[in-house]
């Protein structure tokens, strides 16, 4: 390994190690800066080294990446260049940190740093996909002003994005600039743009523009452009204009296909212009060309890839409504992507797919189900599952698991249970995750008895419960005042060798304290101390103290904390003192602090400082001043 690469690896690993647990968000801190100084590499820092550290080590930790980037800029004699900016923009792009990207780009402009064209391309694409097309426009302007060549596909995606996002003034400026600079237009960019432009333009102006663009850009698909224009005109009640330009479009190499003719014919049905409809249908038979499915396939995939989902949906609706052929993978892509913005249309695409004798891929159904749940469309979810069930779609473990888990997420408990029973009739054994999902759905719906019944069913079926099973049930039973039942489950899980987690201890203790079963709560806490990590015990202890005080047992909480092993847990002492202050139980607090002073005087200052800090953030700090003074007097 080369020395520069070795150093980048050392720095990257050190940053990840010092910044904390991989589960938590990694935040830049003075401790990290101190650690970097200890590595002693400041004399050899360079933009390429910064880039090697950020990519790959910090790509998924934007805060850490930005902290390291800014720290490097402060080192004597160092300045960033295109390479280091590329790496930080890449990290920020992955986590969609658009504000930070905008601030950095302003820095680039003010410092007159010349970025590589690949950095501009990446920035523009990221911003367009993040629906920040206006910001992307200014990035492109900067790239053009520095003489950079930006690939036409990037410019076309931006043109489509500006138009689709409603930034029409910017779209028009970009369109003019692309033509002026000789940047070629393609079907995606020009198609989305002309679909908007034709809504308010005169037909002569429209045809003249299309003719000029088509002659200069032979790669543009004329039939697709014709469909987009005619569809847009009909949408804004200009079906007569659409009718009159049919022949003109043919003359400028934009031959309307059968779908284009059908769009106008259907618009005339709506307006009652039946004579004109007949004329259009005759023209269709005489002059229309069959739509090339491969062309529309490529166009729809381009729209989906560019996240122009509304436009993709509208083109697909024209195809579906006319029962024109569409490949299965295109329907899969449409159902999965369009469901994010228009779940109703996505379900209609599914209905169309099934009517043609095709069925969706499991990943497509998963995306559709997820988005239906996100949009709170449980009725649509049921409709989709019933349709697929009638075609024998649910026949193996994976598809049944998907259906049941999403029915549970949608809160459709009865339908979930019915599906579970059907699954068992098919000879398929539900696994513990399915039972857990259904039990949790029952608990959320306040259906405790069915949840218990499912527990019994798991036992009969020989399905082994896991931590999640116990967690869900113990938490709910504790909430519902069934502490004895939750304790029974707790004992069973210990017998079966399943280690409780922090949530289980806290749920049990909270439920037992509410029911004034203090000794039982103490016993649960002792088991926590025997079995668990000190950090967990400390958090559970603080929660235990809070629950004791909340239920009128401040004296017992103070007594609990007087056990030697809890003395150093200062956070729990602060919880107690804050609770007794709020409850105006000053004497308990004073006696507790006197005891601490007797057994460990050094802790008094720490606890007092923490207590005062917690009161400073209180909504009514004045109310506890007498308590603080009384504590100080101890």
UniProtKB/Swiss-Prot annotation:
UniProt cross-references to InterPro entries, sorted A to Z: Pentatricopeptide_rpt, TPR-like_helical_dom_sf
The organism's place on the tree of life at top rank: Eukaryota
Pfam families referenced in this protein's UniProt entry, alphabetically: PPR, PPR_1, PPR_2
GO CC field: chloroplast
Keyword annotations from UniProtKB, A to Z: Repeat
Segments annotated as PPR repeats: 81-115, 116-150, 151-185, 186-220, 222-256, 257-291, 292-326, 327-360, 361-395, 396-430, 431-465, 466-500, 501-535
Matches recorded under PANTHER family: PENTATRICOPEPTIDE REPEAT-CONTAINING PROTEIN 4, MITOCHONDRIAL-RELATED, RESPIRATORY COMPLEX I CHAPERONE (CIA84), PUTATIVE (AFU_ORTHOLOGUE AFUA_2G06020)-RELATED
Family per similarity comment: Belongs to the PPR family. P subfamily.
Name of the protein: Pentatricopeptide repeat-containing protein At5g14080
Organism: Arabidopsis thaliana (Mouse-ear cress)
């Amino acid at each position: 390994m080369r020395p520069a690469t070795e150093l980048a690896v050392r720095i990257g690993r050190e940053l990840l190690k010092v910044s904390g647990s991989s589960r938590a968000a990694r935040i830049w801190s003075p401790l990290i800066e101190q650690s970097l100084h200890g590595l002693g590499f400041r004399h050899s820092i360079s933009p390429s080294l910064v880039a090697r550290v950020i990519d790959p080590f910090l790509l998924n930790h934007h805060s850490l990446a930005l902290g390291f980037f800014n720290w490097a800029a402060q080192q004597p004699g160092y300045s960033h260049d295109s390479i280091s900016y590329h790496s930080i923009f890449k990290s920020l792009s992955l986590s969609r940190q658009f504000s930070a990207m905008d601030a950095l780009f302003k820095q680039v402009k003010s410092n007159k740093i010349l970025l590589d064209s690949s950095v501009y391309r990446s920035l523009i694409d990221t911003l367009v996909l993040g629906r920040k097309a206006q910001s992307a426009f200014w990035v492109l302007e900067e790239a053009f002003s520095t003489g950079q060549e930006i690939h036409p596909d990037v410019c076309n995606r931006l043109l489509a994005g500006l138009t689709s996002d409603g930034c029409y003034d910017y779209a028009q400026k970009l369109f003019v600039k692309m033509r002026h600079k000789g940047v070629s237009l393609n079907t995606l960019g020009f198609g989305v743009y002309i679909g908007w432009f034709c809504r308010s333009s005169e037909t002569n102006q429209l045809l003249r523009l299309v003719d000029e663009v088509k002659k200069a850009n032979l790669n543009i698909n004329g039939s697709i452009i014709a469909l987009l224009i005619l569809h847009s005109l009909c949408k804004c009640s200009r079906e007569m204009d659409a009718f009159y330009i049919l022949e003109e479009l043919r003359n400028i190499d934009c031959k309307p296909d059968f779908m284009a003719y059908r769009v106008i014919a259907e618009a005339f049905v709506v307006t009652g212009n039946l004579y004109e409809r007949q004329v259009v249908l005759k023209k269709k038979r005489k002059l229309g060309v069959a739509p090339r499915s491969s062309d529309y396939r490529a166009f729809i995939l381009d729209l989906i890839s560019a996240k122009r989902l509304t436009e993709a949906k509208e083109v697909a609706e024209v195809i579906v409504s006319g029962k024109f052929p569409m490949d299965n993978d295109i329907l899969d892509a449409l159902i999965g992507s369009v469901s994010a913005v228009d779940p109703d249309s996505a379900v209609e695409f599914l209905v169309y797919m099934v009517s043609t004798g095709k069925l969706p891929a499991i990943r497509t159904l998963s995306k559709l189900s997820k988005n239906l749940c996100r949009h709170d469309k449980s009725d649509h979810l049921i409709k989709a599952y019933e349709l697929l069930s009638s075609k024998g779609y649910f026949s193996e473990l994976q598809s049944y698991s998907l259906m049941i888990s999403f029915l549970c997420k949608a809160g459709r408990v009865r339908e979930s249970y019915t599906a579970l029973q059907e699954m068992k009739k098919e000879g398929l054994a539900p696994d513990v995750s399915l039972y857990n999902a259904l039990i949790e759905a029952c608990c959320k719906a306040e259906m405790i008895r069915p949840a218990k019944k499912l527990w019994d069913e798991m036992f009969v079926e020989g399905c082994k419960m896991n931590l999640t099973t116990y967690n869900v049930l113990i938490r709910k039973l504790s909430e519902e005042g069934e502490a004895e039942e939750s304790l029974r489950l707790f004992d069973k899980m210990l017998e079966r060798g399943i280690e409780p987690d922090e949530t289980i201890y806290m749920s049990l203790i909270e439920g037992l304290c509410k029911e004034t079963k203090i000794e039982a709560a103490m016993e649960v806490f002792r088991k926590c101390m025997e079995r668990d990590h000190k950090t967990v015990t400390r958090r559970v202890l603080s929660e235990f103290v809070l629950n004791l005080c909340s239920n009128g047992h401040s004296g017992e909480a103070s007594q609990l904390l007087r056990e030697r092993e809890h003395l150093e847990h200062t956070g729990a002492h602060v919880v107690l003192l804050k609770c007794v202050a709020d409850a105006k139980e000053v004497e308990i607090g004073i006696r507790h602090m006197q005891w601490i002073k007797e057994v460990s005087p050094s802790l008094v200052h720490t606890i007092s400082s923490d207590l005062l800090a917690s009161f400073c953030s209180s909504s009514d700090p004045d109310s506890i001043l007498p308590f603080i003074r009384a504590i100080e007097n101890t």
